[in-house]
């Protein structure tokens, strides 16, 4: 793809991309994944938060997914994904009255971009 941008932004590392990493893994013509979880854009980490409490963001959400599966007993992919999103928003509620670059906006962006690509009715680990 021809790069027509005049600024090399650190947000995209100066390279526009046509698809997210999760979709790339799923659509692979050499036998893609049956499902993927991941960010559709620039994923944030707790280090990107500005407030005194450095918790949340993508690494927190990933941990919540495995907590849903391993500790809460969510064995269906969509159920574990939805539970992780719900748990994250209960811990980090979004305040839509705040500025766009506050931590609450980062939390909103985190859950909006963390998508499940694939069949949500898949059982994690398969059937016996």
Enumerate the predicted regions with their spans:
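Active-site-proximal C-terminal subdomain of hydrolase catalytic domains
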Residues: 9-128
């Amino acid at each position: 793809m021809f790069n027509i941008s005049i600024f090399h932004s650190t947000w995209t590392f100066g390279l526009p991309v046509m698809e997210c990493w999760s979709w790339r893994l799923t659509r692979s013509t050499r036998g893609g994944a049956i499902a993927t979880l991941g960010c559709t854009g620039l994923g944030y980490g707790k280090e990107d938060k500005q407030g005194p409490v450095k918790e949340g963001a993508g690494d927190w959400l990933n941990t919540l997914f495995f907590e849903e599966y391993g500790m809460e007993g969510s064995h269906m992919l969509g159920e574990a994904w939805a539970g992780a999103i719900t748990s994250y928003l209960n811990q980090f509620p979004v305040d839509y009255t705040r500025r766009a670059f506050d931590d609450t906006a980062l939390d909103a962006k985190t859950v909006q971009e963390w998508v499940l690509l694939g069949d949500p009715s898949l059982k994690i680990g398969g059937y016996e």
